[in-house]
Amino acid sequence: MAVGGFEMRIGNGYDFHRLVEGRRLILGGVEIPYRLGLLGHSDADLLTHAITDALLGAACLGDIGRHFPPGDPQWQDVSSLLLLSKVLELVRGRGLRLSNVDAVVVAERPKLAPHIPAIRQSLAGALGLPLDRLSVKATTNEGLGPVGEGLAMACHAVVLLEE
């Protein structure tokens, strides 16, 4: 869609991970103090994964699993911010510019509101975006399903790219 002479592309990303003992809880590159962490091949930062997938979708470049296969040892325990930076290079290489990000983390526990400012700062730096173009919110699942029972977390992200 062209608006004001710019072609715009919207991407949607989603991620879901189980919470387990013995792992750190990383969201947006920030470690959140909690007794459980997210299970995954990398650091399992589902917020960064959802944003990464949204970027790939908007650029029509596939999905995060295609670029960083979960069975590939080079991505074992890697920071998801590294994956995000590699995807940003691909997106920018196609002549696309990130305009804004809106994301919502769905988690019953821990309460994320106190950590949102640090998460936004971390992601703004990684994405090269001013804070007024990066929204991160948190909500619960009202006690329903695996997320509501505190067994998992989910994240939805939307990005807008401009050509």
Swiss-Prot record:
Q: Name one GO molecular function term.
A: 2-C-methyl-D-erythritol 2,4-cyclodiphosphate synthase activity
Q: Could you tell me what reaction this enzyme catalyses?
A: 4-CDP-2-C-methyl-D-erythritol 2-phosphate = 2-C-methyl-D-erythritol 2,4-cyclic diphosphate + CMP
Q: Report whether Metal-binding shows up as a keyword of the record.
A: yes
One Gene Ontology biological process:
terpenoid biosynthetic process
Q: Where is this site: Transition state stabilizer?
A: 41, 140
What Pfam families has UniProt attached to this entry? Answer: YgbB
Cofactor annotation comment: Binds 1 divalent metal cation per subunit.
Signal peptide positions on this chain? none
Enzyme Commission code: 4.6.1.12
What does the record note on quaternary structure? Homotrimer.
Query: What is this protein's function?
Result: Involved in the biosynthesis of isopentenyl diphosphate (IPP) and dimethylallyl diphosphate (DMAPP), two major building blocks of isoprenoid compounds. Catalyzes the conversion of 4-diphosphocytidyl-2-C-methyl-D-erythritol 2-phosphate (CDP-ME2P) to 2-C-methyl-D-erythritol 2,4-cyclodiphosphate (ME-CPP) with a corresponding release of cytidine 5-monophosphate (CMP).
State the protein's name. Answer: 2-C-methyl-D-erythritol 2,4-cyclodiphosphate synthase
